[in-house]
């Protein structure tokens, strides 16, 4: 099939398609670089909460990863890891969240500048086991997590 551009042929759709393709191709390297950058999860505010929706048949795996997370935080030689552990609570809701179990991380106070990304903490603490642990962690999720940054409004105990 041969296309010609002329006043009657109207080649504007072709130029639009070409521009779209070039735009996608030119942005692909930038996206790949952004994805390759290490992930970190910081809580810049007073505290945070993370809602985790876990598959019913994967709760034991998730809880096993949480035990490894605690072990990794406690055995770290970095003082901020012990501070993180002191303010990090993991709750399990007795009610289902739809078809899934709900686990809630409550982080208060948040350690300013500390990385709360579980994959980074596990990789740091267990470099040879990290892939297997993190595969269990990833497979346990029914859907992504909801992350909420929090500012303390009032401490009712003080």
Question: Where are the predicted features?
Answer:
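N-terminal secretory signal peptides that target proteins for export/translocation
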Residues: 1-11
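Bacterial N-terminal signal peptides
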Residues: 12-27
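Signal peptide processing junction and immediate N-terminal pro/mature segment
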Residues: 28-34
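An amphipathic, aromatic/His-enriched active-site/gating alpha helix that lines ligand/cofactor pockets
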Residues: 34, 68-86, 99-100, 107-158
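N-terminal secretory signal peptides
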Residues: 34-87, 91-93
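Short, surface-exposed coil-to-beta transition loops
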Residues: 47, 100-102
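Divalent cation-coordinating acidic motifs and surrounding scaffolds
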Residues: 96
